[in-house]
A protein has these predicted regions:
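Conserved PLP-enzyme active-site core in the AAT-like
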Residues: 1-196, 226-227
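Conserved C-terminal alpha-helix-loop-beta "cap" of PLP-dependent enzymes
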Residues: 177-244
């Protein structure tokens, strides 16, 4: 579930990674995310580890129990870094999971362009607390970041945040109204399954794994239909102009 930027960092800094593998969500082919038990066991076996990095939410919207993981990581005196690229909208509406920042993560990366109205490449690195040195963070930011930042992108991020501040509540309320309408219409489907937060599937997943589901993600399961995933993708794109 890691972004290739993580592997680039490992290569450039000559780090020694320890890999933890998430379980598959029961009844699906979806990779879950990590649990506090997995992380605690890994920290016991690797006491010289500097930090824990995990992806939450995943590309499919599956979210880890960041609060309990943060407590575990900090108990061992380590830093928690969360790649929340697909969770830039977290914390802006009670219908979404809380932001990792609010749950104890020391560093959180969010990609505005993935789930918010912003230009491609726009992202934020969020810091909480003093476990990570701000001076050191700024030092390496200056090393790896361009010395000629795009004012177009910075203006886009400002505009995005301004819109969320002024109109976000109403826009998210409208989103959830339309979402409920969509799910109600999908409830009559006999073969095509819709997997998202609030459905029987997500409640079962949470009870079995402890993972949460991002309400902003809507997954479709085609295994009980005559369609392949690729064919379903093509139909949505060509006939309905929806790209997934």
């Amino acid at each position: 579930n890691c972004h290739k930027a993580v592997y680039h960092s490992i290569y450039l800094r000559r780090l020694t990674p320890v890999y933890l593998y998430p379980d598959i969500v029961p009844g699906t082919s979806l990779a879950g995310t990590l649990t506090k038990e997995q992380i605690e066991a890994a920290l016991i076996q690797n006491p010289d580890a500097s930090a824990v990095l995990l992806t939450s939410p995943t590309y499919d919207g599956i979210t880890a129990d960041i609060a309990s993981i943060a407590e575990t990581v900090h108990r061992f005196g380590k830093t928690l870094i969360v790649d929340a690229a697909h969770g830039a909208h977290f914390g802006f509406h009670p219908g979404f999971p809380k932001s990792p920042v609010a749950l104890g993560a020391d560093l959180t990366i969010v990609s505005l362009h993935k789930t918010m109205p912003c230009l491609t490449q726009t992202a934020l690195l969020l810091q909480k607390g003093s476990r990570v040195s701000t001076e050191r963070l700024r030092l390496f930011e200056g090393i790896y970041q361009t010395s000629s930042p795009s004012y177009l992108m910075m203006a886009a991020m400002d505009s995005c945040m301004d819109m969320v501040k002024k109109h976000g509540a109403g826009l998210w309320d409208s989103f959830f109204t339309e979402r409920e309408r969509f799910l109600e219409r999908c409830s009559s489907l006999k073969r095509l399954q819709v997997l998202t937060d609030g459905t029987k599937w997500s409640r079962k997943m949470t009870s079995e794994t402890g993972f949460l589901m991002d309400s902003g993600k809507i997954l479709s399961e085609t295994s009980k239909t005559c369609l392949t995933g690729k064919r379903f993708y093509d139909i949505l794109l060509k006939q309905y102009h929806l790209q997934i």
